[in-house]
Amino acid sequence: MAKKGKLTPMMQQYMQIKEENKDCILFYRLGDFYEMFFDDALTASKELEITLTGKNCGLEERAPMCGVPYHAVDSYLNKLVEKGYKVGICEQVEDPSQAKGIVKREIVRIVTPGTNISQQSLDDEKNNYLMCIFASDGSYGISFVDVTTGDFRTTSMDSLAKVRDEIFKFEPAEIICNDAFLISGMDFDYLKDKMSIVISSIEPYHFDEEQAEERIKRQFKVGNLEGLGLVDYPMGVIATGALLGYLHETQKSSLDHLMHIDAYETSEFMIIDSSSRRNLELCETLRDKQKKGSLLWVLDKTKTAMGARMLRNMVEQPLVDKKKIEERYDAITTLTNQTIVREELREYLNPIYDLERLMTKVSYKTANPRDMIAFKTSLELLPAIKTILEECKDPLLSGLREDLDPLEDIHDLLEDSIIEEPPLAIKEGGIIKEGFKDDIDQLKRAKTEGKQWLMELEEREREKTGIKNLKIKYNKVFGYYLDVTNSYKDLVPNYYIRKQTLANSERYTTEELNQLADTILGSEDRLYALEYETYVTIRETLAGEMERISRTANVIAQIDAMASFAYVAERNHFVRPKLNVRGTIDIKDGRHPVVEQVIPNDMFISNDTYLDNKKNRVAIITGPNMAGKSTYMRQVALIVLMAQIGSFVPAAKANIGIVDRIFTRVGASDDLASGQSTFMVEMSEVANILRNATKNSLLILDEIGRGTSTFDGLSIAWAVVEYISNSKLLGAKTLFATHYHELTELEGKIDSVHNYCIAVKEQGDDIVFLRKIVKGGADKSYGVQVAKLAGVPDAVINRAKEIARELEEHDLTSGAKDIMPYGEAQQLSFFRESDEPTMEHPFMAELREKDLSDMTPLEALNYLYVLQEKLKNEE
């Protein structure tokens, strides 16, 4: 970077502003372009694929430079922000005609991934959160906001795992934090690389507790924190204050649209850890990260962007409060029973624009006249929606009707003031309706009639002078003038004042034309200025009503979400679940909500499920791969989750005991980036489940122990089942799929464990998966048959059958003995003891004396060979 002393005055100004904003790419306004210089130009030209040029800057070498036109800045800005850059918008803040020297410029806004308000780059159906995390001595404060909608929340928590779960739940675009969080052990590479979250630490002064409280009180205009419900969230208060400080520094505005903050406890909602969210594919699929194929894809048939975001939030945060869940059920029941009412509502909801994000544009003073028309056309629909809701008598919908403010005064203001098809620009007139403001009407008449005045003057001058082709013309340099061709210049009278001589004509003016031009041009300038001033006043009026508009937007979102749930329930034959506090999960003819959408002709096979907290805690599920075990288990988890969202469920009947958490351990994939093997990842997830599950949790465990040797894997799986089923240790309701058929022996040994399997029909050497869960354990794995179905060559299949027969003849577990209950003093053994007393082999004593911990793997292997040779010699 160059030294400022050698630079031109303009470049010195640029360098001074850049010095104060080193972490930004600076968009420096120069006329009709935003220019970038030096390193910023090198970066931006590469990322935006635009031409890199140079500019004389006072140095020997030209400064690298690139630029983008101001009218197309959003698309370029969005590209940089989506790539994780911060962009500082540097505008001219004084009229160049009034400037003495260099035009004054300032940063008016810093755009970051979490503060981008451009609707071109944002997903209408998803919030764009900026999250702040404050870490101190093992405690954490989290605060996050969507500046485009005003959604603002905070909480405090006591573990990094909970912080991780919140990050996965809300998927912020950007995280700011203190330095302590950067060394907390969070997997930042995953957050950056897999979730595309931009993460940065901010200055320590942002996290000063006293300053944080003051920022909060100023923002929400309160004298203390009690009224905001923040007193019990000290860590959240610090995070919120830091977040507000960062927003004020980057947005350079008052942020008046951030009017409320919601302090919440994670215990208010079902806890679903990050792994379970991925495995259950709540909002996006595991494979391609798309909405299609997820639970949200099935449930979201909303008509508005606000409703889509609301419904997504409901899916992300299932409830645990029975009363709140039942309220949603009642609303859905009303809307499924009253089909005409529901469809009328959806018809009126469909044209409503995104009021929340329109309000943010009003707050940021970027709302254009067409945004105002979008507001008006949306508000026109509210009275009809309020009237339709009179037919709905359930508490939730009745309450929403009462809360729905039709905003008729705002609608009338916009109806009276803004023309139906206004321009985008706000400084070039053509915005305000005739009859709204007398001064504007008079100036419009002057502008319109001025053209007639010019035509009349032109005609008079032709008659007076005899110049038949005399015309009054206009350009920006001379304004209005009389144009006389050379063939008539001898007829020009003395009172004509020459302005310009051209090859074929002369240009003149007169006193009368000058006066008329002043009137016309002055009226046009005054008209544009007065229309702009009036438009700004209208926009400020809307800004003063933000709280009312925000409440109405929230009501519309809730109505839309409830109508979507009802529509989906009716179309897919979902039923209203019953809720119980006994902990029983009783599902009749349950179906997978997503899979049944993609299977043609109602071919999905439904299944029953019964789990409780006493005699039916653990269901061990055996059966071949591809038979449907994983689909069935996910199905049960999704039905429970849907029930607690407040949605109806895919089943003939369902009675659901409210669960506090759902954990899933499904599938395996090496976490190579962090150096963890498949088995290590599996065991870490199992450890997390066993540490954090409660007796009120639902566990979905698939193939525990398959990432290691057969006996180790079986041992671990066995021990996990014993631990989970023991009410003194855990006692959680669990679906446990396994290929270890030995685990079926636990039925009868542990009262709360029962066997189930996937029914299979054998047809010679072939099998047919019936997809039906039946009682009892599978007697075969059918692995060879599955391999055949998968297309493995016949030669391999035939050889596999031979090997399978040989192994069956030497069954290693045929002598397994009874397993003692968990916790008894004696070690458990998988091998049945002989009834006859046995003599210890001499090698056993020798082996017992060996210190294996001092042996290298090679030494241990050599020792094993020695023992083997001795045994062979004995034979």
Which ranges hold each PLM region?
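Charged, surface-exposed helical/loop "interaction arms" that form contiguous linear patches used
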Residues: 364, 368, 378-381, 399, ...
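Amphipathic heptad-repeat alpha-helical coiled-coil/stalk segments that mediate oligomerization
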Residues: 207-215, 219-222, 271-274, 286, ...
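Active-site phosphate-binding and catalytic loops of NTP-dependent enzymes
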Residues: 90, 113-122, 254, 390-396, ...
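Amphipathic alpha-helical coiled-coil segments
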Residues: 325, 332, 342-348, 375, ...
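C-terminal tails and terminal domains of large nucleic-acid-associated
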Residues: 840-875
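ATPase nucleotide-binding head domains, primarily ABC-like/P-loop NTPase cores
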Residues: 38-39, 233, 303-304, 314, ...
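Conserved catalytic alpha/beta cores of large enzymes that bind or transform nucleotide phosphates
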Residues: 167, 172-180, 186-189, 201, ...
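Charged catalytic and DNA/RNA-contacting regions of genome-maintenance
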Residues: 2-334, 350, 354-363, 367-459, ...
